[in-house]
Regions:
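Acidic/glycine-rich C-terminal interaction modules and beta/coil loop segments
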Residues: 66-169
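Short, positionally conserved secondary-structure boundary motifs
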Residues: 4-92, 154, 161-169
């Protein structure tokens, strides 16, 4: 408990930790968010579609967490991180929760997107000329720029609103 951690008094293990087993149902006030793979069907304009990853276990979130963050869980998808370009924030194998209803870029936030045929998760900065700076957190990676006349190749999947995984903080 917080009291035990701060004062050494009280019950060490009091709290609201809930352990679920595979056969358990999700408790009231919680929701499962499965992991998805993003697929792109290209015509005149590529639009992402989401395929649920059946071999992955869903993450369980409190519904209150979504309310506290102003998010609708129906618009959120979990995606798997691949690569080391976002270390030390995101690590290979981590999962991120993306708000796929978010279609306006807030400069300095992390987004999942497709550009030039590749799917990425990066920090985006808006430019006054209408382009973007694509920033990797890994200091070994250089920033990229997307020029205003290249924005027709840019497809926003969603804003990253949470991460989970085994990478250190």
């Amino acid at each position: 408990s917080v009291q035990w951690l701060t004062t050494g008094k009280g019950d060490m293990k009091s709290g609201s930790v809930t352990t679920l087993h595979d056969e358990d149902t999700v408790p009231e006030g919680f929701i499962e968010i499965p992991e998805y793979r993003v697929e792109f069907g290209c015509g005149d304009r590529c639009n992402p579609s989401f395929e649920e990853v059946s071999e992955s276990k869903p993450a369980i979130y409190r519904l209150q967490w979504f309310r506290d963050h102003g998010l609708n869980p129906a618009h959120c998808k979990r995606l798997k991180v691949s690569g080391d370009s976002m270390i030390p924030i995101l690590f290979d194998g981590d999962s991120v929760l993306c708000d796929c209803s978010s279609k306006e870029i807030i400069s300095g936030k992390i987004y999942a997107f497709c550009f030039g045929g590749s799917q990425r998760i990066k920090r985006l900065f808006t430019k006054l000329n209408g382009g973007l700076i694509v920033h990797s957190e890994n200091p070994n990676e250089q920033d990229e720029e997307i020029a205003p006349d290249e924005m027709d190749q840019f497809i926003l999947i969603g804003r990253v609103v949470d991460r989970s995984g085994s990478g250190p903080f």
